[in-house]
A protein has these predicted regions:
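Structural signature of the Rossmann-like NAD(P)-dependent dehydrogenase/reductase core
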Residues: 1, 48-54, 104, 130-132
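Short, small-residue-rich loop/turn micro-motifs
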Residues: 2-4, 51-54, 91-93, 173
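Active-site proximal helix/loop that lines the substrate pocket
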Residues: 2-5, 57-60, 94, 120, ...
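Catalytic helix-loop patch of NAD(P)-dependent Rossmann-fold dehydrogenases
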Residues: 4-54, 61-71
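Short acidic, glycine/proline-rich loop/turn micro-motifs
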Residues: 60-62, 100-101
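C-terminal catalytic core of Y-nucleophile DNA break-rejoin enzymes
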Residues: 70-73, 107
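C-terminal substrate-binding subdomain of Rossmann-fold SDR/epimerase-dehydratase oxidoreductases
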Residues: 78-188
Length: 188
């Protein structure tokens, strides 16, 4: 599933927070979660919902390759490498510390570990877990971190916010940490 199923708020999101997607993507994820609950009820099919926050990173040795890249971190790194002239910042008037969206970036290897634990811990009663680090980074913070690491200036331009982009999506991973002993091992 996805963090996109939640109603936006300016603090960490828990599994019991209000479900109210702000975009089509989140709505489809929530509908699928509801379908799984019906399948469990009618057919006894057990499942675990893992609500991802922003997946990032690459598997070591495999890398990452998206055609028509849309993910912030690879775009920022492309700009640092001179493959892009600048980064578009979609919205600079959000109610956040620097006006840009804040996201919780969770490494794909940490997501893989959560999936393995889900297979080991599936029960008759469906469970839902947030899979994130509990730390949020704004778009400008990601750009600044990339500049610090690469030593390159990354140019950015503010453009209009995209419809349905939440201001703040950061996980409260307490439930998965306590119940399964899972914790993100990678940071930004």
């Amino acid at each position: 599933s996805s963090a996109a199923v939640y109603k936006t708020k300016d603090t960490q999101l828990t599994e019991s927070d209000t479900l109210s997607p702000e975009n089509f993507y989140g709505e489809t994820k929530l509908k699928f979660e509801r379908l799984l609950h019906w399948y469990n009820r009618i057919h006894g099919i057990n499942f675990v919902s893992l609500r991802y926050f922003n997946a990032s990173g690459a598997a070591y040795g495999l890398g990452e390759n998206h055609e028509q890249e849309t993910h912030l971190i690879p775009l920022v790194l492309q700009a640092a490498l001179g493959k892009k002239d600048c980064i578009k910042i979609f919205g600079s008037n959000y109610p956040t510390s620097d006006g840009t969206c804040v996201r919780d970036y969770i490494h794909v290897l940490d997501l893989a570990n959560a999936h393995l634990l889900a297979l080991e811990n599936i029960r008759e009663t469906p469970q839902t877990y947030n899979v994130g680090t509990g730390k949020g980074y704004s778009v400008r913070e990601i750009i600044n971190i990339a500049e610090d690491i690469t030593g390159k200036k990354i140019f950015a331009v503010d453009v209009l916010a995209r419809e349905g982009d939440a201001a703040y999506l950061v996980a409260d991973p307490t439930k998965i940490e306590k119940e399964w002993g899972w914790k993100a091992e990678h940071d930004i």
